Amino acid sequence: MKHLFLSALILLGLTSCQIAGLTSGYSHLSDAQKERVITLEENIDDIHDFSKVYKVSLNQVKQYIETHDKVLLYNYTPFCHSTYCVSPAALVPQCKDKGINVLVISNIYDDIFKQKHTTFPMLMIDTKQFPTKWRAKYLDLFYSPLTGHTDKELNYANFHYFEKGKYVKSYKNSNDI
């Protein structure tokens, strides 16, 4: 009887757990937050309302890279506190001073609205374009066609640099850019 009660208690605890990071996390958003997530229909350059999160396709990002001389894609994880993760609000002006356009592309919705961004758009991978709900898989499916490398081959770098439409290099540390 004691083991049955303990097993039931553990099972109840596990069913109430929410594991962040395996999927996009869209289901974790409140209804008000979901209303602020917009599927972008036009070009990335046409975004002027920075209070929303814009789901972007691989083709929209390719088009942006092809039409700007220097582009840095930041594979952004909002809740990351590693030394390799930086605030987009700090990264964007640092790169603009070097003449580099930055696209901050979140790879998950968890904590995406905690960061204030008033000078750049917050983008999110439109996961519906890929045949998987698993974050690690859709990240590879999104970035591999752009860089020509898998996430593992790039040693899981979060900063991908392009010049004149061509992939140049990926960086783990934003200070190396």
Task: Say what each PLM segment does.
Residues Y26-D46:
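Post-signal peptide N-terminal segment of mature Sec-exported envelope proteins
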Residues Q18-G21:
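Bacterial signal peptide processing site
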Residues G13-S16:
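C-terminal motif of bacterial Sec signal peptides marking the signal peptidase cleavage site
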Residues M1-L4:
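Positively charged n-region of N-terminal signal peptides that target proteins for export
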